[in-house]
Amino acid sequence: MARKKIALIGGGQIGGTLALLAGLKELGDVVIFDIAEGLPQGKALDLAQTGPVEGYNTALSGANDYKGIKGADVVIVTAGVPRKPGMSRDDLLGINLKVMKQVGEGIAKYAPNAFVVCITNPLDAMVWALRQFSGLPHNKVVGMAGVLDSGRFRLFLAEEFGVSVEDVTAFVLGGHGDTMVPLPRYSTVAGIPLPDLVKMGWTTKEKLDKIIQRTRDGGAEIVGLLKTGSAFYAPAASGIQMAEAYLKDQKRVLPCAAYINGQYGVKDMYVGVPVVIGAGGVERIVEIDLNGSEKKQFMNSVNAVKGLVDACKKIDPAVAKGAAPAKKAAKKK
């Protein structure tokens, strides 16, 4: 049986951490792609030399040509630039939209059968653009946001209650940004919903509101502390969790930026919702019941994402049309 192949587009902090985690978990052989000559090759060599120490047998390589990702089973995209001081939203969109065009065309040509996870920001708009430029099926292209945001929410709740993070379940709906919607009503500690824990005196609504706001500001908090960078360990771990669910057909229920067309009253959009990820990619959209307040917050988040997508269409009108459906490569015998 042929080993799986994982292609990482972008050799920065997240890309390098993704490669290490893929190696440690032995999910498959890894190729790191980056336009900077020597960078992906150097990181791949360093990580390959880590194998004998850590005890993994993953083959790692670097590439500066999209041919290197040929036949990949999973592609994780981190390429692009972060938002810098003085940079407008449209500036960031313009730069990363061009990157998504190049990446999407590369995936369509060399890895049309892949399951694609996008991590590039602004996430919800970039995963939409990547799907448009690649022409891959909607169920095979997803954005990593909710797993990370939910992980942050779970950590803050576990710290508040003094319990293990393993006993805390929580998820976040909506876009990856200020308008994300953490849902206390659907979040639990050992099966006990957060509103009940408030009634039991474990915390207060005011403290819970602060935790929710801290979750929304999770990325900015890390940027403020680092000063010269942004989060990369947790984003990489989140991306690997999604890739592993696909490669091992785990049927994991994970919050992701997925394509919805009618669910939640939203049409033709990528936005954060709980989904089932298995060998078929996104196999099901989990449509939970939202009360009036939750629905209002969710639609506010959807509208914020729509604003980003509309801005992308103005910057590059061709993205609205999208690419022709990617031609699937012949299956290996």
UniProtKB/Swiss-Prot annotation:
GO terms for biological process: lactate metabolic process; tricarboxylic acid cycle. GO terms for molecular function: L-lactate dehydrogenase activity; L-malate dehydrogenase (NAD+) activity. Gene3D superfamilies: Lactate dehydrogenase/glycoside hydrolase, family 4, C-terminal (3.90.110.10), NAD(P)-binding Rossmann-like Domain (3.40.50.720). Its EC number is 1.1.1.37. This is Malate dehydrogenase. It comes from Parvibaculum lavamentivorans (strain DS-1 / DSM 13023 / NCIMB 13966). NCBIfam families: MalateDH_bact, PRK06223.1. Transmembrane segments: none annotated.
